[in-house]
Amino acid sequence: MNADGPVVNVHVLFFAKSRELANTPRSTVDVPTEITATELLDHLVSKFGLTSIRDNLILAHNESYIDNLSDRILFKEGDELAVIPPLSGG
């Protein structure tokens, strides 16, 4: 992750399998104020050991789903990021 520019602290919430793998329901990370969703996902996967579910994760920024991994995300201090794996069940 390239952090040459300004960096902010973001709250990360983990759900279901991502919570189990990260071994915590929530954390904080420092991220650049502007980053692609792919770069962000790769950083979270590496930092929190989410490799086994990487290809199935959904990210949400301030309660809005990130639909395209090529999207650039603009973060402000204290923003919220949710890491959501697909839910299964019946």
Swiss-Prot record:
GO-annotated biological processes: Mo-molybdopterin cofactor biosynthetic process
Modifications the protein undergoes after translation, according to the UniProt entry: C-terminal thiocarboxylation occurs in 2 steps, it is first acyl-adenylated (-COAMP) via the hesA/moeB/thiF part of MOCS3, then thiocarboxylated (-COSH) via the rhodanese domain of MOCS3.
GO cellular component: cytosol; molybdopterin adenylyltransferase complex; molybdopterin synthase complex
Pfam family, one: ThiS
Keywords for the protein's UniProt record, in alphabetical order: Cytoplasm, Molybdenum cofactor biosynthesis, Nucleotide-binding, Phosphoprotein
Pathway in which this enzyme or protein is active: Cofactor biosynthesis; molybdopterin biosynthesis
The UniProt record lists the keyword Nucleotide-binding: yes
InterPro entries: Beta-grasp_dom_sf, MOCS2A, MOCS2A_euk, Mopterin_synth/thiamin_S_b, ThiS/MoaD-like
Nucleotide-binding in keyword set: yes
Modified residues (1-thioglycine): 90
Major localization listed first in the record, in broad terms: cytoplasm
Other comment: This protein is produced by a bicistronic gene which also produces the large subunit (Mocs2B).
Family classification: Belongs to the MoaD family. MOCS2A subfamily.
Subunit organization: Heterotetramer; composed of 2 small (Mocs2A) and 2 large (Mocs2B) subunits.
Function (record text): Acts as a sulfur carrier required for molybdopterin biosynthesis. Component of the molybdopterin synthase complex that catalyzes the conversion of precursor Z into molybdopterin by mediating the incorporation of 2 sulfur atoms into precursor Z to generate a dithiolene group. In the complex, serves as sulfur donor by being thiocarboxylated (-COSH) at its C-terminus by MOCS3. After interaction with Mocs2B, the sulfur is then transferred to precursor Z to form molybdopterin.
Protein's UniProt name: Molybdopterin synthase sulfur carrier subunit
Annotated organism of origin: Drosophila simulans (Fruit fly)
The encoding gene: Mocs2A
